[in-house]
From Swiss-Prot:
Organism field: Arabidopsis thaliana (Mouse-ear cress)
Record region (Disordered): 1-71, 127-149, 283-375, 387-406, 470-492
Pro residues biased stretches: 1-10
Keyword Endoplasmic reticulum found: yes
InterPro entries, sorted: ER_body_metal_sequester, IL1/FGF
Family classification: Belongs to the CCC1 family.
Chain's role: May sequester excess cytosolic iron and manganese into endoplasmic reticulum to reduce metal ion toxicity. Not essential for the accumulation of ER body components, including PYK10.
Acidic residues composition-biased segments: 480-492
Name this polypeptide is given: Membrane protein of ER body 1
Quaternary structure (record): Interacts directly or indirectly with NAI2.
Biased composition (Basic and acidic residues): 283-300, 307-316, 339-361
Sequence intervals crossing the membrane: 209-229, 250-270, 508-528, 540-560
Gene Ontology terms: cellular component: endoplasmic reticulum; endoplasmic reticulum membrane; ER body
Secretion signal, residue range per the UniProt entry: none
Gene: MEB1
C-alpha cells in the first residue's frame, strides 16, 4: 500500500521555510553551516509526546501544533519552491521517523495504517575515484542525472522504493493513487494491450496460377510448331547402315494438343464457378436477416441502458461493472421488452395466436443471476443462456462436423493414408509416363521413379512436422450473423485427427507415401518382361490402370473422411487431375525428346566405323 498524507500547510517564522503536500511539521530556516550539506537530516533529537495533537474532524485530517513540539523539531535545509520536488526522499524519512504525528491511510480501501515501519541503517558503499570524477564532471557542466536529483539513503531501494513505484521519481513526488486504483480494478497491470485483428472478407481476385498455365501452353505451342515444321533430313551416307531402333508409335501432335487444352479449360471453368459462388448454404443465409433484426432490438435496448447507467454513475462516482455483451446485462433490458410487448398487444388486440407465440419466442430472455450468487451458479446460468441462442439449423450440422463418429480410430487411419498416398500416387504416375514417352530404357525409368520418391519423402516429413507445430488459430466471425461464435480452428485435427496420436499418424502417412509412390515404377519395371512388339505401350497402359485404381480408392476414402461426403465430385476431381497431369507430362516428354534428336543438340548413338 502507498501511504498518503493530507496536506496541512503551516506558517513560517522567517519566511524561507519549505512547503510540501505531505508534511505537517515544517522546520524553521537553516543555519549557514547546514546549507553545505546536501539534503542531510538530523535524527538526534528525541521525539515529543502525542498529548497536544489537535484533530480536525471536519476535514478528516490531523494537524499538529508546531509550538507544542519544539523539542522534536527536525533540521532541514530550506529550499526554493522550484526545487521542492527534490526533497521527496527527506520528506519520506521525516514521515517514517515521526509516524505518530501523521494520519496515514490507504487510498484504495480508506483504512488507517496502524503498523509502524522499522528501519535499519546500512553503511553507504565506498565511492571509487571514477565515480568521484564523474560527479565532478557533472557538476562542472551543470547537468544532473536522474539519480543525483536527491540524496537517496542506502536502505531506500530495499524498503521505501516499492511504495513509490513511479518511473519519474525526481519529477513526480507523489504516486497518482487514482490511476493505480483504476488499473488494479480493471486488472491490466503488467499486461500488454491485446489487439484483435479480424480478417477481411475474401474478395474475388484473379488467381496467379492462371499465368503459369498460360505460360506452359505458350511453351508447348512453340515446341509443337518447331517439331512439326519442315526441316531437311540429316545427310546419311548410303554405305552406312545405322542400327534400327524400335520407335514408339504416338498419336499425332494435333490430337495430343486437344487433351491438355480441354483439361485446362475444364479446370478454368470449375475454378471460376467455385471462386464466385457464395460460401454458405441457403439454410444459413436464411437465418441471417432474423439474427440482424434481433441484434437491432438488442442495440436499441442497450442504448437506453447506457443512458441510465451514465446517470447513476455520475451520482455514485464509482466504477461500473463492465459486461461482456449486451445479452449479459441485468434484467432492465427484459423489463423494457416486456413493456413494449404489452403496448403492442393493447394496440392490436386482434392478433393471431401464432404471431403471439412467435413474439414470445423471439423476445425470450434468460434469467441472469444476482452479483451476490456464487461463481459456480453464474457459470451454469451463462451456459444455459447460450443454449437457446443457437439457430435451429446448427443442430443438424453438429453431428457431421463436431461430434466424433463411431470408430474414430479408423477414420484417423484413413486420413493418414489419404494424406500420404493420394498426392504421391499422381506425382509418381506423371514421372513414369513422362520418362517412358521420352524414350528412356526400363532401367532408367525405374531408377528415375525411385529417385523422385526419395526426394519427395523428405518434403513429406517436413510438411508433417510443420503441420504438427502449427498452433490452433482463432476463428473470428467476419459476417453479421451472430449465431457463429468465435472458436479455435485446428488444422491438424481436420487433416489427420487428434494430436495425441501424432506418432501413429506420421508412421501411417510415411508408409502410405512410400507404398503408393513405388507402385508406378515397379509396375513399369517388372511387367511384360518378355520381348514382344509394343512392349513399352503395354507397360504404360499397365501403369495407367494400376495408378488410376489406387487414385480412385484414395479419392473415395478422402470423400468418406471429409465433412461433406461428395463422392462423385471428389472422385471426378482427382481422376481428372491424374489423367490430365500424366497426359500433359507424357506429351511434353515426347516433344522434347523428338526436338532434341532432330535439332542435333544431343546425340547418344554409338559411333560406327566407316567401311
Amino acid at each position: 500500500m502507498d501511504p498518503t498524507m493530507n496536506p496541512t500547510p503551516t506558517p513560517s517564522s522567517a519566511g524561507n521555510s519549505v512547503c510540501t503536500d505531505e508534511l505537517t511539521n515544517l522546520p524553521p530556516e537553516d543555519s549557514p553551516l547546514d546549507s553545505e550539506k546536501d539534503d542531510s537530516v538530523d535524527f538526534s533529537q528525541e521525539q515529543g509526546s502525542e498529548s497536544n495533537e489537535a484533530i480536525d474532524t471536519e476535514n478528516g485530517s490531523r494537524s499538529v501544533d508546531k509550538n507544542q513540539y519544539s523539542e522534536t523539531e527536525v533540521v532541514v535545509r530550506a529550499k526554493d519552491l522550484q526545487t521542492e520536488p527534490d526533497s521527496l526522499d527527506d520528506d519520506v524519512e521525516i514521515v517514517i521517523k515521526n509516524q505518530h504525528k501523521y494520519y496515514i491511510y490507504c487510498p484504495c480501501c480508506g483504512e488507517d495504517i496502524t503498523k509502524t515501519v522499522k528501519l535499519v541503517k546500512i553503511s553507504d558503499p565506498k565511492h571509487t575515484k571514477d565515480h568521484d570524477k564523474a560527479v565532478d564532471s557533472d557538476t562542472e557542466n551543470g547537468s544532473k542525472s536522474k539519480d543525483k536529483n536527491t540524496k537517496v539513503p542506502s536502505w531506500f531501494s530495499d524498503f521505501i522504493q516499492p511504495l513509490f513505484s513511479s518511473e519519474d521519481r525526481g519529477k513526480k513526488g507523489v504516486v497518482d493513487s487514482e490511476l493505480l486504483g483504476t488499473y488494479e480494478d480493471l486488472g491490466i497491470i503488467g499486461e500488454e494491450p491485446s489487439i484483435d485483428v479480424s480478417n477481411e472478407k475474401d474478395r474475388p481476385s484473379f488467381p496467379k496460377w492462371y499465368l503459369d498455365v498460360f505460360a506452359w501452353l505458350f511453351l508447348c505451342i512453340i515446341i509443337a510448331l518447331s517439331v512439326l515444321s519442315t526441316s531437311p533430313p540429316p545427310f546419311i551416307q548410303p554405305h552406312l547402315q545405322l542400327p534400327s531402333m524400335p520407335t514408339l508409335r504416338m498419336p499425332s501432335a494435333s490430337v495430343l494438343l486437344l487433351l491438355p487444352t480441354s483439361a485446362v479449360l475444364l479446370l478454368f471453368i470449375i475454378s471460376m464457378r467455385s471462386r464466385f459462388t457464395p460460401r454458405y448454404h441457403k439454410e444459413k443465409g436464411e437465418v441471417v436477416p432474423k439474427s440482424t433484426d434481433s441484434k437491432s432490438h438488442d442495440d436499441q435496448a442497450a442504448n437506453t441502458d447506457q443512458d441510465f447507467d451514465k446517470k447513476t454513475d455520475n451520482k455514485r462516482n464509482r466504477l461500473t461493472p463492465i459486461y461482456p455483451s449486451s445479452l449479459e446485462k441485468p434484467s432492465k433490458q427484459t423489463v423494457n421488452k416486456e413493456t413494449q410487448n404489452h403496448d403492442k398487444e393493447a394496440a392490436d388486440p386482434d392478433q393471431d395466436v401464432d404471431k403471439e407465440t412467435e413474439n414470445q419466442k423471439s423476445h425470450l430472455t434468460p434469467i441472469y443471476p444476482s452479483p451476490l450468487e456464487q461463481p459456480s451458479k453464474q457459470i451454469i446460468n451463462k451456459e444455459t443462456q447460450t443454449e437457446p441462442m443457437l439457430p435451429p439449423n446448427a443442430q443438424s450440422e453438429i453431428p457431421n462436423s463436431v461430434e466424433p463418429r463411431k470408430g474414430g480410430n479408423k477414420v484417423e487411419i484413413l486420413k493418414s493414408i489419404v494424406y500420404g498416398g493420394l498426392t504421391e500416387s499422381i506425382t509418381s504416375l506423371c514421372t513414369v509416363t513422362s520418362a517412358a514417352a521420352s524414350g528412356a530404357s526400363t532401367l532408367n525409368v525405374l531408377a528415375l521413379g525411385v529417385a523422385n520418391l526419395s526426394s519427395g519423402l523428405l518434403l513429406t516429413v517436413h510438411s508433417l512436422q510443420e503441420l504438427i507445430n502449427e498452433k490452433p488459430r482463432k476463428q473470428t466471425n467476419t459476417d453479421d450473423s451472430p449465431e457463429e461464435g468465435e472458436g479455435e480452428e485446428d488444422r491438424y485435427e481436420e487433416v489427420l485427427g487428434r494430436r495425441e496420436y501424432s506418432r501413429i499418424h506420421r508412421v501411417i502417412a510415411i508408409s502410405s507415401f512410400v507404398i503408393f509412390g513405388l507402385i508406378p515404377p515397379l509396375v513399369y519395371g517388372f511387367s511384360f518382361r518378355k520381348k514382344m512388339e509394343k512392349r513399352q505401350e503395354y507397360k504404360v497402359l499397365a501403369v495407367y490402370a494400376v495408378s488410376l485404381l489406387c487414385i480412385v480408392l484414395l479419392s473415395i476414402a478422402k470423400a468418406y473422411v471429409s465433412k461433406k461426403r461428395d463422392y462423385v465430385k471428389t472422385l471426378f476431381r482427382y481422376t481428372t487431375t491424374a489423367t490430365t497431369a500424366s497426359g500433359f507430362s507424357q506429351f511434353v516428354g515426347y516433344l522434347v525428346s523428338q526436338w532434341l534428336e532432330k535439332s542435333g543438340f544431343y546425340d547418344d548413338s554409338p559411333e560406327t566405323q566407316r567401311v
